[in-house]
Design a protein with these regions (language model features):
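ATP-dependent carboxylate-amine ligase
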Residues: 6-172
Length: 172
């Protein structure tokens, strides 16, 4: 948003009308895997699968909570990689954050993602948690549990491959 506002300000300085300057911005669809919101057969998918840090994961959870949603809000969260010696702590902090920004269901994929569940439980959260061990198991869970009106967030480090689960949802 800040970049778009800066572009509009520069256009204004050069005498370009706001309508003319805004027109290309209206066609901008964002960057693949970075908070792209897609509507698929009655299901809203937030594809934030490209990468993850504690700050960006919390932001994704906030976006999930802010969207209008007729069904369940489901956070599909995978490992955050390359965080250094405080990796476990950072995952647990995301879990504690979920208590204050609840989803209806959390699906965890990866060894480190289990620490998100530990952080949620330690904070006293009672959101239903499901742990999956593979992308295939995640796809099966999605088939069995996602319904019309649901909103899903896919968030994790790129190396976890959540973009494949998003592609699976798009193919359904």
């Amino acid at each position: 948003v800040q970049n778009a506002l800066a572009a509009l300000a520069v256009a204004g300085e050069y005498g370009i009308s706001m309508e003319m300057a805004a027109e290309p911005l209206c066609r901008f669809e964002g960057f693949k895997g970075r908070q792209q919101i897609v509507h698929l057969n009655g299901v809203t998918v937030i594809d934030d699968s490209y990468n993850a840090s504690p700050v960006s994961m919390k932001a994704g959870i906030e976006v999930l909570g802010s969207l209008p949603c007729e069904g369940k809000r489901i956070a599909v969260l995978a490992d955050m990689k390359e965080l250094g010696p405080d990796t476990v702590k950072f995952h647990q902090e995301v879990g504690a954050f979920l208590k204050e920004h609840p989803a209806d269901q959390v699906v965890l994929y990866g060894e480190l993602a289990k620490e998100i569940g530990a952080g949620l439980k330690a904070a006293g959260g009672d959101i239903p948690l499901t742990e999956v061990k593979s992308l295939e198991e995640l796809e099966q869970w999605l088939d069995d549990h996602v319904a019309f009106g649901d909103c899903l967030l896919f968030k994790g480090s790129n190396s976890m491959g959540l973009s494949k689960a998003v592609a699976y949802m798009k193919e359904k």
